[in-house]
């Protein structure tokens, strides 16, 4: 039987506010346990929550960025459940009236196409604390520093049909929240976590299959692996005569398997009701327009502009627009070098490789956009060849200065004097007279391979400094003359 996969995602983004959503406690990551937990965060009797306006602004900003309806009358609700790191016995969240309603996001896929993914809603809520099992023998420690940190939970429609589409969607959300400056997107620190809802159904069937939710997956690679593992588990289970049970599962990267945590709860299990300590939130038109005016150019628009303005492919434009820092770096390189396609290639390939090796982000690059743009300018004006450029790039990465300084210091300027190149070629051909005779006696098919030999000898003789295009043209004329 052929199966169709149905995937919906819930992405929890930790908002980059200075203080928590309902208290004045700081949100700094990595502080000593329980040093950033106020009486409100601890759930002490008699204290009242006060809503952080900046968290509301950030949520509205996201809603506008994904073409969503904004709930101008939205309500906070209590989500009731017991867990040791939830001191109040309930989480303040939103249920019937979220701050962000239906929207959509167009995501670029690997094959160059673009797919529209629906967004069901995005709601504000407070994060829970953290249970620490590894640091204690026979007991669990509770760190409430995270309790009350503002979260925006972004719920997608079940529009994804494979793990790669799911990863592309998460990457698109990741890029948008970073562009907006509302979340740092640090998945290793838990700033962006993903719950993956996965089900399968026979191809052509309209009704959804029974879904399972994989909780708290915190890397793009693990999202893909967890979803693929769960898809295979469900297919194997059904084809062996079993039945998928709706449940919450965890992904174990060591075994590349998902394992059951508990049966999946429904909304009524949490006994949601409006929080009596918080008034409804009324968002005025003026607040909406003021927030809309602060929106930057977002990845989808930047991607389209890179394609139309610079003639880049969908893939190249998507990669370069994937982070605000990378897009800004690329545009600065283009403004200096004047060659967008050459700049795109160097930023994605050579610079990307360097940053990966050194474990750096682009805003930590040892080669500045000004340096790279200056070097590319020397390629386009024939001062250096592409091969020599790699040597110059390496030298710049090692702190040897600008491209011009490296070229001057190392004597790497390309030879473009046709007289000097002709003289050098005459010496090369004289030293390889036998091969010249063989070339002239050979047919066209063999000549192609033999020509490469002469080019190699010429570049070796010039220590890589001769202009390759001139070498090719003059060499061809001499061999066939």
Curated annotation (Swiss-Prot):
Q: Which InterPro entries match?
A: Asn/Gln-tRNA_amidoTrfase_suB/E, Asn/Gln-tRNA_Trfase_suB/E_cat, Asn/Gln_amidotransferase, Asn/Gln_tRNA_amidoTrase-B-like, GatB, GatB_C_1, GatB_Yqey_C_2, Gln-tRNA_amidoTrfase_suB_CS
Q: Which SMART domains match?
A: GatB_Yqey
Kindly give the Pfam families that the UniProt entry links to this protein.
Answer: GatB_N, GatB_Yqey
The UniProt keyword set, sorted, is:
ATP-binding, Ligase, Nucleotide-binding, Protein biosynthesis
- PANTHER family (UniProt xref): GLUTAMYL-TRNA GLN AMIDOTRANSFERASE SUBUNIT B MITOCHONDRIAL AND PROKARYOTIC PET112-RELATED (PTHR11659), GLUTAMYL-TRNA(GLN) AMIDOTRANSFERASE SUBUNIT B, MITOCHONDRIAL (PTHR11659:SF0)
What family does this belong to? Belongs to the GatB/GatE family. GatB subfamily.
Q: What is its EC number?
A: 6.3.5.-
Protein's UniProt name: Aspartyl/glutamyl-tRNA(Asn/Gln) amidotransferase subunit B
Name its GO BP terms in alphabetical order: glutaminyl-tRNAGln biosynthesis via transamidation; translation
Enzyme class comes to ligase
Gene Ontology terms for molecular function: asparaginyl-tRNA synthase (glutamine-hydrolyzing) activity; ATP binding; glutaminyl-tRNA synthase (glutamine-hydrolyzing) activity
Q: What does this protein do?
A: Allows the formation of correctly charged Asn-tRNA(Asn) or Gln-tRNA(Gln) through the transamidation of misacylated Asp-tRNA(Asn) or Glu-tRNA(Gln) in organisms which lack either or both of asparaginyl-tRNA or glutaminyl-tRNA synthetases. The reaction takes place in the presence of glutamine and ATP through an activated phospho-Asp-tRNA(Asn) or phospho-Glu-tRNA(Gln).
- Which catalytic reaction applies to this protein? L-glutamyl-tRNA(Gln) + L-glutamine + ATP + H2O = L-glutaminyl-tRNA(Gln) + L-glutamate + ADP + phosphate + H(+); L-aspartyl-tRNA(Asn) + L-glutamine + ATP + H2O = L-asparaginyl-tRNA(Asn) + L-glutamate + ADP + phosphate + 2 H(+)
HAMAP family this protein is in?
GatB (MF_00121)
Report quaternary structure and partners: Heterotrimer of A, B and C subunits.
């Amino acid at each position: 039987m052929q199966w169709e996969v149905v995937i919906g995602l819930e992405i929890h983004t930790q908002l980059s506010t200075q203080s928590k959503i309902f208290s004045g406690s700081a949100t700094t990551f990595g502080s000593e346990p329980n040093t950033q937990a106020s009486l409100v965060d601890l759930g002490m009797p008699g204290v009242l929550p006060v809503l952080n306006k900046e968290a509301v602004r950030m949520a509205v900003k996201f809603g506008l960025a994904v073409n969503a309806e904004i709930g101008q009358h939205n309500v906070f609700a209590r989500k009731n459940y017991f867990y040791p790191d939830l001191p109040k016995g309930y989480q303040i969240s939103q249920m019937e009236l979220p701050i962000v309603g239906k929207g959509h996001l167009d995501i670029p896929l690997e094959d160059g196409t673009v797919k529209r993914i629906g967004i069901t809603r995005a709601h504000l809520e407070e994060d829970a604390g953290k249970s620490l099992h590894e640091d204690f023998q026979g007991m669990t420690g509770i760190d409430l520093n995270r309790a009350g940190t503002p979260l925006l939970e972004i719920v997608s429609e079940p529009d994804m049909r494979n793990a790669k589409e799911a990863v592309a969607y998460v990457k698109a959300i990741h890029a948008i929240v970073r562009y907006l400056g509302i979340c740092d997107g640090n998945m290793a620190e838990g700033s962006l976590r993903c719950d993956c809802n996965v089900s399968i159904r026979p191809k052509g069937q309209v009704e959804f299959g029974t879904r399972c939710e994989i909780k708290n997956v915190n890397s793009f690679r693990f999202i893909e692996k967890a979803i693929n593992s769960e898809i295979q588990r469900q297919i194997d289970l059904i084809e062996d005569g079993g039945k998928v049970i709706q449940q919450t599962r965890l992904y174990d990267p060591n075994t590349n398997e998902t394992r059951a945590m508990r049966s999946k709860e429904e909304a009524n299990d949490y006994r949601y009701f409006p929080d009596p300590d918080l008034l409804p939130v009324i968002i005025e038109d003026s607040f909406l327009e003021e927030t809309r005016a602060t929106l930057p150019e977002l990845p989808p628009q930047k991607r389209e502009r890179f394609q139309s303005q610079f003639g880049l492919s969908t893939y190249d434009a998507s990669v370069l627009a994937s982070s605000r820092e990378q897009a800004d770096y690329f545009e600065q390189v283009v403004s200096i070098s004047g060659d967008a396609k050459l700049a795109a290639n160097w930023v994605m390939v050579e610079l990307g490789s360097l940053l990966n090796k050194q474990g750096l982000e682009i805003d930590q690059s040892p080669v500045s956009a000004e340096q790279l743009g200056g070097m590319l300018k020397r390629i386009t004006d024939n001062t250096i060849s592409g091969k020599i450029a790699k040597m110059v790039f390496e030298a710049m990465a090692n702190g040897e200065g600008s491209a011009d300084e490296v070229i001057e210091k190392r004597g790497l300027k390309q030879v473009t004097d046709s007289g000097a190149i002709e003289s050098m070629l005459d010496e090369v051909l004289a030293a390889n007279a036998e091969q010249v005779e063989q070339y002239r006696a050979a047919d066209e098919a063999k000549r192609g391979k033999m020509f490469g030999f002469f080019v190699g000898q010429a570049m070796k003789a010039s220590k890589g400094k001769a202009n390759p295009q001139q070498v090719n043209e003059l060499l061809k004329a001499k061999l066939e003359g």
